[in-house]
């Protein structure tokens, strides 16, 4: 039997609720401590991708950094309904540069 990973999104209600329609497991968190605990808990529960709003991620950089060195789960930062802080884009830029040895963005 093939292992199927789940997808989760963590953030404030207004930013993440629409993901439920797509079949993504939604975890509504309001502060950094709760977000940190939620990420650590669901990372152990067969989630392959965890989307986190940039608004929360900016307050838990050590947790995000810890999971960036892991293959699974992939923690991906997304803008909240308040707009982008460009943290996610910056991380993608760094990963692309690391992978190909040149900055392209």
Curated annotation (Swiss-Prot):
One matching Pfam family: ATP-synt_F
Keyword flag Chloroplast: no
Record-linked InterPro entries: ATPase_V1-cplx_f_g_su (IPR008218), ATPase_V1-cplx_fsu_bac/arc (IPR022944), ATPase_V1_fsu_sf (IPR036906)
Keyword Transport listed: yes
Entry GO MF terms: ATP binding; proton-transporting ATP synthase activity, rotational mechanism; proton-transporting ATPase activity, rotational mechanism
GO terms for biological process, alphabetical: proton motive force-driven plasma membrane ATP synthesis
SUPFAM superfamilies: AtpF-like
Keyword terms, alphabetized: ATP synthesis, Hydrogen ion transport, Ion transport, Transport
The family this protein is said to belong to: Belongs to the V-ATPase F subunit family.
Function per UniProt: Produces ATP from ADP in the presence of a proton gradient across the membrane.
Protein name: V-type ATP synthase subunit F
Species of provenance: Fusobacterium nucleatum subsp. nucleatum (strain ATCC 25586 / DSM 15643 / BCRC 10681 / CIP 101130 / JCM 8532 / KCTC 2640 / LMG 13131 / VPI 4355)
């Amino acid at each position: 039997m093939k292992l199927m990973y789940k997808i989760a999104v963590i953030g404030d209600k207004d930013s993440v609720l629409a993901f439920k329609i797509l079949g993504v497991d939604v975890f509504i968190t309001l502060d950094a401590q709760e977000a940190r605990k939620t990420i650590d808990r669901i990372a152990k529960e067969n989630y392959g991708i965890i989307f986190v709003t940039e608004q929360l991620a900016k307050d838990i950089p050590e947790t995000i950094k810890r999971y960036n060195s892991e293959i699974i789960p992939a923690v991906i930062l997304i803008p909240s309904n308040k707009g982008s802080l460009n943290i996610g884009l910056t991380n993608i830029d760094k990963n692309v540069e690391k992978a190909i040895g040149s900055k392209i963005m």
